[in-house]
């Protein structure tokens, strides 16, 4: 039995390692502007150089950019703490995602094939992805197996909410592919090193009300 104390929780998870490029810096950099011009000539809306830079165009035709900066789990945690926040624990994340459900998924023990699931376009569904909607707590959580969230328990980092897309990339299908978004899924073989993988690792800030009242 676990007690989940009152929390203030970030609605959507945040990406790691990427730092926004200012509009002015983007305009002044000739190399980046040449990359944008080349992309536009080819009808592309995004340019990605792995773990270096990402330039992307939004629906209003405006170009934005972000730079990749390698960081560690410990640096991320310290930065979060410096701003008065915390990372959720595994049990806290499970409750935020499942509300204490006794089933594999918050909606039951199997995949609902009427859902529109990301990375499963062969299901021939249109419109908004089902799991990208707010849950019972008003959170977007456990929506994409490629996006695993970093949690922290007494000196130990681990992941919840995804496996980095390993099951889907391995061709295991929709049920096994989406099993990692289950509140209770835990990959015991997943090794956690020192550095964060900015393409797959995300985080969510929380504030523990009891901690702030002491």
Specify the residue positions occupied by each region the protein language model found.
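Short proline/glycine-enriched turn/loop segments at secondary-structure junctions
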Residues: 179, 186-197
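Intrinsically disordered, low-complexity regulatory segments enriched
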Residues: 37, 98, 181-183
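Extended aliphatic helical segments
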Residues: 3, 9, 141, 151, ...
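Extended beta-strand/loop cores of jelly-roll/beta-sandwich
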Residues: 1-91, 193-214
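Proline-rich intrinsically disordered, low-complexity coils
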Residues: 6, 20, 145, 180-183
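Glycine-rich loops and low-complexity Gly/Arg-rich segments
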Residues: 32-37, 111-114, 173-177
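Functional-site microenvironments in short loops/helix caps that host divalent-cation chemistry
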Residues: 54-171
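Short, solvent-exposed cationic patches
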Residues: 164-185
């Amino acid at each position: 039995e676990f007690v989940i104390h009152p929390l203030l929780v970030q609605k959507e998870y945040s990406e790691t390692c990427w730092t926004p490029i200012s509009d002015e810096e983007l305009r002044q950099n000739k190399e980046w502007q040449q990359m944008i011009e080349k992309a536009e000539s080819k009808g592309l809306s995004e340019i990605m150089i792995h773990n270096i830079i990402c330039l992307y165009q939004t629906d209003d035709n405006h170009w934005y950019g972000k730079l990749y900066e390698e960081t560690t789990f410990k640096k991320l945690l310290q930065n979060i703490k410096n701003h008065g926040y915390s990372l959720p624990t595994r049990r806290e994340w499970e409750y935020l995602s499942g509300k204490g459900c006794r089933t594999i998924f918050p909606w039951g023990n199997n995949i609902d094939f009427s859902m529109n699931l990301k990375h499963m376009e062969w299901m021939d569904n249109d419109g908004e992805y089902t799991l990208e909607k707010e849950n019972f707590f008003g959170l977007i959580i456990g929506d994409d197996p490629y996006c695993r969230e970093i949690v922290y328990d007494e000196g130990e980092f681990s992941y919840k909410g995804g496996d980095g897309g390993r099951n889907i990339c391995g061709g295991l299908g929709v049920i096994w592919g989406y099993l990692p978004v289950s509140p209770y899924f835990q990959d015991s073989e997943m090794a956690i090193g020192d550095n964060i993988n900015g393409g797959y690792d995300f985080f969510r800030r929380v504030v523990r009300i009891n901690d702030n009242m002491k």
